Curated annotation (Swiss-Prot):
Protein family according to the UniProt entry: Belongs to the class I-like SAM-binding methyltransferase superfamily. RsmB/NOP family.
Name of the protein in its database record: 28S rRNA (cytosine-C(5))-methyltransferase
Function (record text): S-adenosyl-L-methionine-dependent methyltransferase that specifically methylates the C(5) position of a cytosine in 28S rRNA.
Knockout consequences: Increased lifespan and stress resistance.
């Protein structure tokens, strides 16, 4: 005799996901931290369903309310209901098992679909998948040859193509097409639908291909240390930008990569080793304690400090994230300290790139403004000019001589993560504005 629905347990995966969602909503805890703390479920599956909920939360909650799912079933755990509805409408489109909650949600399927349809859910098209060639292990020619033999077709633009032409071409990539980036050599662009394909690809696992958003590649591109230079990466973990700098330098010279957290330091060591970075010297320590005596020959510095992360497109949020002025003030203070230390502590430094994955001016233009006031021996270079003027988004014009020279990557218009970049150069003796 078959079991009654009340006696059939909800699958562990659904219960674990609902537990995480409940903690995130009620305690405003970080979803990713909660996922990695969950020991009894498949983390990839948890991540997928919660991301779908994050992307469609307004429509899902409206559908649940309009159909009376929770009102008609008062004993139904709201978090579990949200997870099951997410899976049914936006995930695998089916539910496992015959438990009472699963059967209940299935019985509401048509009503839920009608509500979603009436709501007119308009999903934002995901940005493309960026894949960077790690030239320590694999050349551009080898990568292009591999793609050609794998039946990928390269979409090419004329030499005089504008940035607008480039963005239009990305949006119209056919399923089997890819492009090379307009700004960063070795960055390949694929349609968004292939994101998971590359996550599992052997070339990625062997570190010959690196999954790195184009926006974060601009830091090494703008810093542009030559082969043989001495570079300091002050806040280096997990190490993707360090590897890219190593590629720019053709694996010749020296890169000091600094990280103060033990776990992140170990990740930095592992990534740079696996990526074939012969010139990287990982250092466990605080960037603010770095001295010119220990690093006398530093010429180029990357400053990529802790920030709010407000520009990151892969963040999962299940509650509104208001601008937290107190937190931004603390972050700004730390950012000013680190960037100012980079400017003042190393006598042979020529160029500094400052980068955040934030879209808040408190962490960007205001930090640049204060550090230039504290360190008049430095000047701003134009990031837009460094990209041959093939860029649209610059800083706030309310910051004279700063806004026009700094650069923003905006998710909607640049099809990347949200990133801010500023480029500083040491003045020659006697040089003035």
């Amino acid at each position: 005799m078959s079991k009654k629905p009340h006696s059939i347990k909800v699958p562990t995966q659904y219960r674990a996901t609902a537990k995480i969602l409940k903690a995130a909503l009620e305690q405003q805890k970080c979803i990713k931290t909660l996922i990695f703390a969950e020991k009894h479920a498949r983390t990839r599956s948890l991540h997928t369903v919660l991301k779908k909920f994050s992307e469609n939360r307004v429509a899902l909650e409206k559908a649940i309310e309009e159909t009376g799912l929770l009102r008609d079933n008062p004993s139904f755990d709201p978090s579990l209901a949200k997870i099951l509805v997410t899976e049914l409408l936006f995930g695998r489109k089916e539910l496992n098992g015959e438990s009472k909650p699963v059967q209940t949600v299935r019985s509401y399927k048509d009503r839920l679909l009608n509500s979603i349809r009436d709501f007119g859910v308009q999903r934002k098209e995901p940005n493309p998948r960026y894949v960077r060639i790690n030239t320590n292990l694999y050349s551009l020619a080898e990568a292009l040859d591999y793609l050609h033999k794998s039946d990928w077709r390269r979409k090419e633009l004329p030499a005089d193509a504008s940035y607008a032409d480039f963005l239009t071409a990305i949006k119209s990539l056919a399923e089997n097409e890819f492009m090379t980036d307009l700004h960063v050599e070795g960055v390949l662009i694929f349609p968004a639908k292939w994101s998971n394909y590359w996550v599992r690809h052997p070339l990625v696992h062997s570190k010959r291909f690196i999954l790195q958003n184009k926006a974060t590649c601009l830091a090494a591109e703008l810093l542009a240390p030559p082969s043989g230079a001495t570079v300091l990466d002050m806040c280096a973990a997990p190490g993707m930008k360090t590897v890219h700098i190593c590629n720019v330098m053709q694996n010749k010279g020296c890169i000091y990569s600094v990280e103060q957290d033990h776990v992140r330091y170990n990740t930095l060591c592992e990534i740079t080793k696996d990526a074939g970075c012969d010139i990287v010297k990982p250092i466990l320590g605080d960037a603010l304690n770095l001295t010119p005596e220990r690093f006398p020959d530093v010429e180029y510095i990357l400053v990529d400090p802790s920030c709010s992360g407000s520009g990151m497109q892969n963040r999962m949020t299940v509650c509104d994230e208001p601008k937290e002025d107190k937190r931004l003030q603390k972050l700004q203070g730390l950012q000013i300290k680190i960037l100012s230390h980079a400017m003042g502590a190393f006598p042979n430094v020529k160029r500094i790139a400052y980068c955040t994955c934030s879209l808040w001016k408190e962490e960007n233009e205001q930090v640049v403004q204060r550090c230039l006031q504290l360190n008049p021996s430095f000047k701003l270079l134009s990031c837009k000019k460094a990209l041959r003027n093939k860029w649209h988004n610059v800083g706030d014009k309310d910051y004279p001589n700063i806004g026009k020279n700094v650069l923003y990557c905006q998710p909607d218009s640049d099809l990347t993560d949200g990133i801010f970049l500023a480029l500083f150069e040491k003045r020659r003796e006697g040089e003035k504005d």
